[in-house]
Amino acid sequence: FASINSAFMKQGIIVKVSRDKQVGVPLQILNVSSGGDSGPVMTVPRAYIHLEPSSELKLIVKYVGEGSNYFVNSVQDMVIEDNATLTHIQIEADSKDAWNFSKNRIFLKRDSKYLGYQTVSGTRLVRNHNEVWLNEPGAEMELNGVSVLEEDEQSHQFVRVHHEVENCTSHQYFKNII
């Protein structure tokens, strides 16, 4: 689905945190979708997040919507350079009849850290695909998620971690509440 996002994407957002900069307040990206009366609607949000060495950012990405009959197909690419830390909170709270597919590609360098938290509630189908590359020693990834599901709602979490070198750490923990 990342290829479909690339094919239909017209614009996106770029966030770059400079070397040695600690952003003191969380940054929120709010994706708002609405269904169409005349037929299905697809949105293709795209974000590129780049943390330079020794920087820090808390990022909240939230998906909400009105109506029904829409599909969100998002891609987020995150590059975390040496000694940088990204705390990434992804909240999927689309409407009950929406579908939300997301692809997160995370690239970590030496002694960098990614702390990811994903929450899902109220959406018919959510599919998160997280692919992480631990490319240099000391890189650390922690990914946690919780889904609160009712009736026919579904949440699918796919995680692939590439331990490219020694002395890297990854942890993941997901729970579903039905």
Q: Over which residues does each language-model region extend?
A:
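Conserved beta-strand/loop scaffold segments within soluble protein domains that form the structured core
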Residues: 1-178
